[in-house]
Amino acid sequence: STGAGSPPAFEAAAAGGKINQVIYHSNATMSQMSSASFAAISGYSVAITPSASNSRIFLTYYLSVGLNQDSYAFFQAFRGTTKIQSQNNASSRIGCTVSHSRNSGSTASDQTMTVCFNIVDSPNTTNEVTYTVKAATASGSTITFNKTANDSDNGNTARPTSGITAMEILA
């Protein structure tokens, strides 16, 4: 304000914090894995080229997963080959970004769960960066992506999609 009775005065907003670009990748590829070792999820990645080296990348992940039995699924986020926002292994505990467990009885192989998480990353580059997620499961289990574990042909099972959004936030 410039004083009582005067019209309001406005100042320009600060330059930082603006969204410069948004890249979204949807993945409807149905796949599965039965590995206790982390492996890339087929078709699940997004690439973005920051316009400035001090930009941050805000990432939103959602994964539609199923498990074939009462077990655990573990997920690690990556920028290229660098693990981001993930714990390290500790003794027999598995380090991961997020995890999912199923303990819901015999009909759970007809169900999917959406695993969602966000990360703010500082890649410090103007080169293209690719973000992926790797998954692993407890020994003897199978994780399914974008379908239920048994993929029954009935009105109770789903075939959802997964996706990643990458937003460049200017400094």
Regions inferred by a protein language model and the residue ranges of each:
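Short, solvent-exposed loop/turn segments enriched in Ser/Thr/Gly
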Residues: 40-42
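Terminal beta-strand-rich extracellular "head" domains
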Residues: 25-26, 32-34, 49-128, 132-171
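Acidic-glycine-rich active-site phosphate/pyrophosphate-binding loop
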Residues: 37
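Glycine-rich, low-complexity segments
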Residues: 1-30
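Extended, low-complexity regulatory regions
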Residues: 44-48
